[in-house]
């Protein structure tokens, strides 16, 4: 993404072309989910959450050949590009030039770390796509003019359970994930994995698993006064297959059919900065996703509505509860 933005960003802005990255399972639940939670916080309390954590609480799906090919390509790029590790480890690598700093520490794809989540009272383990999703969320905040503040913090992991059993299960997963990455980086073991373990390009999970797959994420936001707000994003189907296809389709239709209601001009965008409620409403209606706000006494769906207006890539300014948008270039 960083390479594409650097190479073609000026041309996209000049031509008016809108290119939106990360419109599948990575990173729509994270990106649009955080935006949904922050809009609820601003609407209810007048201020955004200073910190949001995303916890993957359910994930049932298979491992496809396309996913394997993506990891193998990342290993290849790491060898060929001396700056690859620097970019992948920089939590603000996808933010516009001049905005690539903040309070977060380095991103790591699969750290050997298990942490306790005091908000949800359970152990968490590394989630292998978290470093990408987190960069997209931070880029959204920057592109929209920092509606969540320049000191906004974001963290994403997978959630299991409490107790010693939960800690041990998470630690085994973390060690296995780290070991797999090391094995994929060594030529001999990489060849063995490709030949005997990893699915081939075009291969994927069986139909039954694709249809019965499910995923759920809980997002916890902390306001400046310590108030906690929680939201939930759920979806049906293997997240990397049919739901991703539906999300990509709805994103394309949003670009084609909702142009007059989009508030951005040409450039490279994220789902939240380009589409916001327009895409949330589409994928809720047609892609099997739901965005829910957890409240005392139950969970209720918060309706979202379309927005209007346009701006250039670096010009969207959003204050608490309202957006001020300069004219399109």
List the model feature ranges, each with a label.
Residues 1-17:
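Rossmann-fold NAD(P)-binding glycine/threonine-rich loop
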Residues 2-4, 26-33:
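Short glycine/serine/threonine-rich phosphate/pyrophosphate-binding segments
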Residues 13-18, 27-28, 35-329:
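C-terminal catalytic/substrate-binding lobe primarily of soluble NAD(P)-dependent oxidoreductases
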